[in-house]
């Protein structure tokens, strides 16, 4: 399959730079997987679409202020984007500089350049950086870091983004991008869903900066997926198996929840799904056999991205591309701060190719 098969024309004006004032008031495009039928509504329509006993699986990762500015002690400006916190003193990061720093290079970080760090090693495209500071890494990031807004949100981060670019249920710091489907859930909607009898479970996948990396090959099968850390604890496994046993649906909130659950299912030795704690490089594209998910809540994704490929594998290629064409025509808002989709599984998708 060619990467260009997943291209579509998107006017710049449809890229959302700010979220809706009220999280759950965004628009919702529903796609019925088996038929391709589309319906237009608002996000709170989920209350009618979900049944008592259905299981929503959220990603409870919390975005860290992962972008740091500063300079090398020798003078050149640098920008650091944390990919992963290794421990209380060290990070793995992307570094943008006129000349890549060598191991041993001293860095002065923060607007006042008061934080001292050392680049200690290089791992492929990533740099290992150690802070020379008594505080834990997370405290340093909270003090001097900027929220790592995606590259297509063409504005500086603002103080408000520290909360707006978080899900209301975020709990475990470690992501450098928000699991954006979850941004639409507010406390009143969550309470109403619980009241209806909808079950909820939480996985953790710390979204890495690799999520924004373009696919740089022509053929999908040649793409090597970036690695991210995921946790699917026993209570999530129990909730999934219980939902399946009683004939209810497992509904993933976002592609990161999909990748977590499907990683746990792939690694399972005996059951449909078993606990999973570790790095995943799962790459889902047309031809993939879904094992766990019955429905998906997700935002609108970039052309030629691995995420639109994941959606195509779930709903079918033609249904997905037609839904995106309709979304553009109907002026839905795209990407992280944009509108959402509710998609049910298309069992025929596995045999469909572009």
UniProtKB/Swiss-Prot annotation:
Keyword Transferase: yes
Domain of life of the source: Bacteria
GO cellular component, one term: cytoplasm
Reactions catalysed according to its record: 7-aminomethyl-7-carbaguanosine(34) in tRNA + S-adenosyl-L-methionine = epoxyqueuosine(34) in tRNA + adenine + L-methionine + 2 H(+)
Pathway annotation from the record: tRNA modification; tRNA-queuosine biosynthesis
Gene Ontology terms: biological process: queuosine biosynthetic process; tRNA wobble guanine modification
Keyword Flavoprotein attached: no
SUPFAM superfamilies documented for this protein: QueA-like (SSF111337)
Primary localisation category: cytoplasm
Enzyme class: transferase
Chain ranges passing through the membrane: none
Enzyme Commission code: 2.4.99.17
Keywords linked to the UniProt accession: Cytoplasm, Queuosine biosynthesis, S-adenosyl-L-methionine, Transferase
UniProt-listed InterPro entries: QueA, QueA_dom1, QueA_dom2, QueA_sf
Assembly notes: Monomer.
Family: Belongs to the QueA family.
Record's function text: Transfers and isomerizes the ribose moiety from AdoMet to the 7-aminomethyl group of 7-deazaguanine (preQ1-tRNA) to give epoxyqueuosine (oQ-tRNA).
Name this protein carries in UniProt: S-adenosylmethionine:tRNA ribosyltransferase-isomerase
């Amino acid at each position: 399959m060619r990467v260009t098969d997943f291209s579509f024309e998107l006017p710049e004006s449809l890229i959302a730079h700010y979220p809706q004032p009220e999280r759950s008031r965004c628009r919702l495009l529903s796609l019925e997987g088996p038929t391709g039928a589309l319906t237009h509504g608002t996000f709170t329509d989920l209350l009618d679409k979900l049944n008592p006993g259905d299981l929503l699986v959220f990603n409870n990762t919390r975005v860290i202020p992962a972008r740091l500015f500063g300079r090398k002690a020798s003078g050149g400006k640098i920008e650091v984007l944390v990919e992963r916190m290794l421990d209380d003193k060290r990070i793995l990061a992307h570094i943008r500089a006129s000349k890549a720093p060598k191991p041993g290079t001293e860095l002065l970080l923060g607007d006042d350049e008061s934080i001292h760090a050392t680049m200690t090693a290089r791992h492929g495209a990533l740099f290992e950086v150690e802070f020379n500071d008594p505080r834990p890494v997370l405290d340093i990031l909270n003090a001097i870091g900027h929220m790592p807004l995606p590259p297509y949100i063409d504005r500086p981060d603002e103080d408000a983004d520290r909360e707006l670019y978080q899900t209301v249920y975020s709990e475990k710091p470690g992501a450098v991008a928000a699991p954006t489907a979850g941004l639409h859930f507010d406390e009143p909607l969550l309470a109403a869903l619980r009241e209806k009898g909808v079950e909820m479970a939480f996985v953790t996948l710390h979204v890495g900066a690799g999520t924004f990396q373009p696919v740089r090959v022509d053929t999908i099968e040649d793409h090597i997926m970036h690695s991210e850390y995921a946790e699917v604890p026993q209570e999530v496994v129990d909730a999934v198996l219980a939902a399946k046993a009683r004939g209810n649906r497992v509904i993933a909130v976002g592609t990161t929840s999909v990748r977590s659950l499907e990683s746990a299912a792939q690694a399972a030795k005996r059951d449909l799904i078993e606990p999973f704690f570790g790095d995943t490089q799962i790459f889902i594209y047309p031809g993939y056999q879904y094992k766990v998910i019955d429905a998906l809540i997700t935002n609108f994704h970039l052309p030629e991205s691995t995420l639109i490929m994941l959606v195509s594998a779930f709903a079918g290629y033609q249904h997905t591309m037609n839904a995106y064409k309709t979304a553009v025509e109907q002026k839905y808002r795209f990407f992280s701060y944009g509108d959402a989709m509710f998609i049910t599984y298309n069992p025929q998708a596995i045999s469909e190719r572009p």
